[in-house]
Every structure is written in C-alpha cells, then in structure tokens.
C-alpha cells in the first residue's frame, strides 16, 4: 500500500505512539506476569490521563522494542516518516494528573530516561534513514525539540505548533464582533515562530469527541462559515511552518470525524462544499508554486510583519530567496468590506491579486476585482510604498509583484538597511 502511494506521488507519515500502551492483559501489560514494559513503581506506571500504562523508557528491553518497532516501519514498510505522539508525556515527570510533585534524581521535573530515549531514537533512525521525517507532537515550551542533538536538541525535524493551533481555533471560533480585542491570539505566534521548526496542525484531534469539525466551529450562517474557513486556511498556508489539514476539512465537512464511518462524500454534491474543495486545491497549488511561501520558513528574513496592531485586519510579507520573490498577505477577520484599504509593500511598480477568497468559484460573491494594482510612494507601516485595495469582507488577498520599479535612491538606501521583522 505504501509503495502504491509512492507511485502515485504520495508520501506516508504514520502516527507512532512510544510513550504509553493499553492495559489489555493480552497485550504488553504484565507481559510475563511482571511489569516488563511498564515501570515497576505503580505510581510511575499508571497514566491517569489516558487510562494506559507508561513505557519505562529507562529499561534496555523497552528501548530495544520501541526502536525496533520504528525501524521496522521505516525499513520494511517504507514509511517516509513518523509523527511521535504525546512527546510531552515522555519529557516530564509531572505531566500526568496526580504527579505534580514528581521529580528526578536532581530535583528537576525532566524525565531523564524519556529525553535520553528520544535522542537515541532519532540518532538510530537518521543514521540509517537520513531523509525521513521525524515529527514531535509536543505541547509544552520544552526547548530545542527540533534542534540537532549535537547542539543540545532532541533531534526531531519538526515540532507540532500546538500553541498556534489552539490560539488560531479560539480566535476563529469567536464571534467576529469581539475579535478586535483578541488579535493577540494571532499575533502572539509571531513572537516564537522561529523557536522551532514547526508544523501547523489542524489534525484529527481537533475534530473528534464532541469538538466539532472545523466547518462547524466557524461562527455565523452557512455562507460566513465557509468565508471564515477560507480565511483561516490562508492564515495557515501563509504563516511560517509546514502544513497539516485533516481529511474532510478540505471541503468543509460539517460532521466531526467518526472513526467508525467514512467521510461525508455526499457533501461534494453541494455546490458550496465543492467550491470549498476547489479553493483548497487552488491554495495548495499556489503554495507549492511560490517559494516565498515556504522557502524561508525558519529564517527571520522570510517573513516581515507589516500590520499587526490594527483591529480586525493584518498584513505581512513572505519572502523567498530570489530577488523580487515575495507574496503580500492581507487578511480581514470581520464581515465588513474595507474599501481603499492601504496594504504596505516593499517596492514601487505594479502588482496583481493572485488569490481572492471571495472569488465566486470559491463560494464567495465576487466575479471581478482590480486586475492591476499600482504602488504609491509613501511610508506606510515601515514600508516605502502602499497599494489601494478593496479588502473583501471576511476574506483574504494574496498579492504578488508584476513589474517592479526602483525606489528613489535615498529611500532605497534607507529601506535596504532595515532588517526584516
């Protein structure tokens, strides 16, 4: 199956759970009548949060079993990577309920055996499979999760940005009337976006067990729910970090995910769901074909925040490595159109709108918009020029340069010396 996916151009990354296991007596629990894989101490063995047993990651047989498991999936099943589940549970002594006062032999809260195991795991994996992806689902502020081991890191390629995900969903679930006072939910992520190499996840965990689907989380009537969803996806696809979107979310499935049932494929007969799928497909193609949206995800020069202190709106610029390769992002988080909205840009010349979320083909109402935008000289939010645009209600624009012109010499020198935010 994995090989067939590879032929079709698909990579496969599997959810892998090395931190804890089920209590069934026909599985690993009390494997030989004694706590073989779990801790001997019942207090440390018990995982109250999930009703499972914690692996004793300090035991040689446990390390061998788990690393052999990982290598089996990579060696024999040809997986392209592993998403390591619940890493926080392996990093801390006091992560679980009832263990708030647990400490290691040095008096700290770090789980020394768990940290050593994760480093050993990544060392073994990359020694044999240097091109696979190892991703940590880790929700704390533990440092250097995605840094190399020889620099003090855990050695993962990427860390899931759970903070970005939680803040984003909290913001977009909110009635737009109140969003102006909660813009910090979005802007706070800019403060730590380079701390790790991040994945921005809208995963299965957020659309199950009564949490509702992404579509169902959105406020307003059906039209505005789709508009919110399109805008949120632009925010995700243009924010620094790799992207993850759970199946069914690409067309706005209304029911949350049920592991005993297939997706609501019938939704695609609805014009709005079909248009939502078209939008997601278009956004994906734009992302893959514009290096400025991904080439410098982890470099400060790759993102410049131009407007983040205004109520209800935001603007920033993503830069690629090539000269004049940049994408301007303008977002409107309320259902009120912004006429003559000034978008800061770094250069004079002409620009074009690459994506308008309110395009009729995507489920919006717009059939036409400004074909060419001409930048006007004048300092605006630290940029030397600005564009006069109509920013759609509850929508977003992606704007790209068409034909740029040099700035006046004095301005060019001044702005060349300004570091990217």
Language model feature labels by segment:
Residues 1-11, 60-65, 112-119, 224-227, ...:
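Aromatic- and glycine-enriched glycan-recognition loops and surfaces
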Residues 11-13, 80-83, 131-135, 197-199, ...:
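Structural preference for beta-strand elements that scaffold enzyme active sites
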Residues 75-78, 128, 238-239, 348:
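Alpha-helix termination/capping residues and helix-transition junctions
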Residues 223-226, 237-245, 249-421:
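Carbohydrate-interacting/catalytic domains
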């Amino acid at each position: 199956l994995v090989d067939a996916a590879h032929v079709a151009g698909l990579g496969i990354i599997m959810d892998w759970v090395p931190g804890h296991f089920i209590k069934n007596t026909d599985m690993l629990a009390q494997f030989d009548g004694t706590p073989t894989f779990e801790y001997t101490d019942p207090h440390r063995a018990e995982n109250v949060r999930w009703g499972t047993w914690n692996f004793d990651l300090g035991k040689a047989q446990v390390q061998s079993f788990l690393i052999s498991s990982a290598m089996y999936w990579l060696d024999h099943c040809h997986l392209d990577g592993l998403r390591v589940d619940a890493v926080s549970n392996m990093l801390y002594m006091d992560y679980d309920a009832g263990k708030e006062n647990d400490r290691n032999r040095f008096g700290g809260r770090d789980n020394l055996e768990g940290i050593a195991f994760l480093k050993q795991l990544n060392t073994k994996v990359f020694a044999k499979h240097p091109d696979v992806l190892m991703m940590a689902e880790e929700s704390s502020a533990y440092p250097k999760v995605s840094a190399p081991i020889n620099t003090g890191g855990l050695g993962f390629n990427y860390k899931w940005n759970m903070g970005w995900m939680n803040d984003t969903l909290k913001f977009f679930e909110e009635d737009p009337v109140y969003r102006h006072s909660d813009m910090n939910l979005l802007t706070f992520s800019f403060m730590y976006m380079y701390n790790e190499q991040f994945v921005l996840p809208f995963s299965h965990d957020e659309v199950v067990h009564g949490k509702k689907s992404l579509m169902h989380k959105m406020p307003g009537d059906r039209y505005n729910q789709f508009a919110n969803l399109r805008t949120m996806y632009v925010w995700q696809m243009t924010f620094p970090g790799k992207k993850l979107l759970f199946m069914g979310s690409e067309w706005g499935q209304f029911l949350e995910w049920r592991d005993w049932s297939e997706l609501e494929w019938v939704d695609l007969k609805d014009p709005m769901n079909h248009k939502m799928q078209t939008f997601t497909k278009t956004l994906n193609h734009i992302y893959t074909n514009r290096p400025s949206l991904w080439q410098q995800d982890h470099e400060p020069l790759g993102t410049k925040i131009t407007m983040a202190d205004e109520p209800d709106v935001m603007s920033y610029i993503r830069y690629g490595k090539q000269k004049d390769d940049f994408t301007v992002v303008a977002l409107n988080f309320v259902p009120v159109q912004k006429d003559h909205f000034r978008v800061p840009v770094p250069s004079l010349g002409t620009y074009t709108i690459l994506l308008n979320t309110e395009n009729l083909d995507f489920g919006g109402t717009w059939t036409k918009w400004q074909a060419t935008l001409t930048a006007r000289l004048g300092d605006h939010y630290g940029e030397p020029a600005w564009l006069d645009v109509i920013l759609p209600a509850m929508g977003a624009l992606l704007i790209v340069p068409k034909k740029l012109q040099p700035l006046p010499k004095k301005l060019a020198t001044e702005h060349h010396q300004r570091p990217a935010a």
